[in-house]
Amino acid sequence: MLGAISLAETDNNVIDRGETTRIMTATRREFIQTSVALAAMPAYLHPAGSAQRTPTNTAPNILWYEDEAKRWLEALPIGNGRIGGMVYGGKSVERIALSESTVWSGAPSTSDVNPGGREHLAEMRQLLFDEKYEEARHLCEKYLLSHSKSFGTNLPMFDLRLEIENSDEPSNYRRSLNLDDAIATVSYESNGRTFTRESFSSNPDHILVVHLSANATGQMNCKVAFSDIKLPGVIAVSASSGNHDPDTITFRGNAFETMHSNGKQGVDVECSVRIMSSNGRRTAAGEHIEIRNADSVTLLIAIATNFAGQKPADDCAKALQSAAAKTYAQLRRAHTEDHHALFRRVQIDLGTNSHSSKMPTDQRRRAVEAGASDPELSALFFQYGRYLTIAGSRENSPLPLALQGIWNDGLASSMGWTDDFHLDINTQQNYWLAEVGNLSESQTPLFTLIDILHQSGQRTAIELYGTPGWVSHTITNPWGYTAPGGGLGWGIFVTAGVWIALQMWEHYRFSGDREFLRHRLYPVFKGAAEFFLAYMVEHPEHRCLVTGPSDSPENAFRSPSGAYCSESLMPTCDRVLVYALFSHLIEAQRLLSIDPELNSKLEAALKRLPPLQVGSHGQLQEWLEDFVEAEPNHRHTSHLIALYPENQISLEQTPQLAKAARVTLDRRINQPNWEDTEWSRANLVNYYARLRDPESAHKHLVGLISKATDDNLLTYSRGGVAGAAQNIFAVDGNTAGAAGIAEMLLQSHEEAINLLPALPAAWPDGSISGLCARGGFQIDIEWQARRLVLATIISKRGGQCKLRYEDKAILVNVPVGRRVRIPLQSFRNSEKSPAKV
């Protein structure tokens, strides 16, 4: 038994406070009581959900380059949760590609549902019962698919273009993105002078800011204009109130396009640039403003739409007036303080490669592609995922992260995908990092969209399926589109709404917020459950409840006759998601002591769901029947939702299913021409972390960084896959890949919080602080030689947590406002956990 240690840490010293806590060691029959040190949290520290730390060394959190960007996927992203910019860092011509999350074509619609679905639903199901899959497919195409004329897409806007006059060829050039400060910087020398350019997108001031300066007076000469205009509209140059010289360039137009809408529907868009120069003179020529002999120049860019009924011109004017009343130093300080409050909650150190750490980021990535080890680049990739989450999704964001976040290269929006919200994995992946990465607030705009789906999905449920409750399918837009999509194989994913709604359950599990559970989560879950209780029918042969017609997105199978088919009854992903919905709702009812009648129905239905099944190859079946896969190299593995992010397959509780999941992975990724995309690679990191296979998880993390990530470390969907003619940026690989790193270091989906469950040999020494675990805990971990040294726990709610390391477990009481330190010897003095590893 460990002796009681009475120590409390303060910022500068250690003093005796005489406080202890209780730890109980997990044995096969009981927890044996023991004591360990309880360190009192200094009073000035924030609770776990908002703790900030000033990093001792922020250099690892910088992307930097020795040349300007030539392509969009070389530019550096900045964002404030709504306004995005891709900064090219040009020496003579700076380009910042502007975007805004609500710049959407399309419009709300109440006529998306196919009018024949409800009438022919029973006929489609009977054909599926009779294994007449080709005939059922024909009816699904005719009576279930929707062909919306007003769905829309997020659209790119245009570039802010700065033509910069340099007296000679710039030297000592460097451009960088500091993740800690969220500032993109360009610096170089010309004619003996040093020039600096800083760009950031400010959430407190609702604007994007560009500041140009030199180390001597009167050196700034440049022209400012909009270029590469992608929206219909007009540009005007004017002088703001009280100014004689022109200082404002304004674009006024519309988000119109004809691929995903009718070319006449879309939001009104306004973008205004206010130019503030220290000394010098401004003149207008056509649609640009020229600045001569200024000491410094500050550009304030405001963007607004009428997405939620606002007046874009008024909103832009208000933002510019407020920002223009502040100095650049004040704007910068407000921005960095706001960003630090989120970003500095988590720090990570995975070790270093002294040679690689001195290289520019693009060279480091290519070195990894060539086989070099660079653990610091993996740490940078993790923090980059958090940075992009902060930059793209804030508590006050009007919309959640779309396929491309809040940035837009014009590629996804100009092909069949659209730059929308895909609910068959991509939007979910965008937020897998949020809770564990200590950015819980970033999910707020997602929950708002889920509330919209909950409302609009009620119309789809009754009109398409004749049921109560609500339903949503594979794709959605800002106005809550919930009808099926326009294509077989992907459009009829009937549990898509459930999958995205499960993010609300994760938020509850991490936060323990009973008010959120009662008032936000419960109505959404109850409505979804009411739909599936009415929608599911008994399979005449298997005697279980089934969904259908439904897809296992976006995959297909061979019918008994060899035909290519995709619509079936109760694909495994549907079973996993309905099981999760019902079981979590039952738990919510227990916690809230409500709805006993519905609870009884859910309990009964839960017992009638089909089991997860192992197929003829030893694989986890993707469908209720053991179909032959039509595309065995397919990128989607939707049935493995059961392994991650859900917890229906585990090494301890379902070892045979865990083995089948591994067989599924081996068969899929070893197929010739496996569809290797950014998000499917990120999946592999998380899957193998759950299987506690650290080397495979690390292998696929390296593969993600080296094979599906460009020089700016943004991930992309590879050209030639899923209809993409070229590599197309998607933010899901960044966020889900970063979530995979967290999953390798900390897992809390089971009974215990598991420390270092999948630590690879490539990270022998390191630390991470500020990760969040389910139950309201925040965890710091230090390790050396691949062995735990110290874990530190903070609880924002107070309570008991079970900690597991390797094959041993201990039970820890963590009072609110206390920092409990758990050294390795706490586990060494325990007996083995009964859990099988």
Residue locations for each model-derived region?
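Extended, hydrophobic alpha-helical segments in both membrane/secreted and soluble proteins
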Residues: 496-507, 520-533, 680, 697, ...
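N-terminal export signals
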Residues: 30-50
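Short, well-structured active-site flanking segments
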Residues: 394-406, 443-444, 511-518, 534-548
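N-terminal secretory signal peptides
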Residues: 1-26, 39, 52
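Aromatic-residue-lined binding/catalytic grooves and analogous aromatic/hydrophobic interfacial grooves
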Residues: 53-489, 506-508, 526-529, 591-594, ...
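Beta-strand segments within the central parallel beta-sheet cores of soluble alpha/beta enzyme folds
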Residues: 223-225, 445-448, 463-464, 516-526, ...
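C-terminal capping/lid segments that line or modulate ligand- or cofactor-binding pockets
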Residues: 73-98, 102-103, 123, 143-145, ...
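Hydrophobic (often cysteine-bearing) scaffold residues that line and stabilize catalytic clefts
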Residues: 377-381, 426, 443, 496, ...
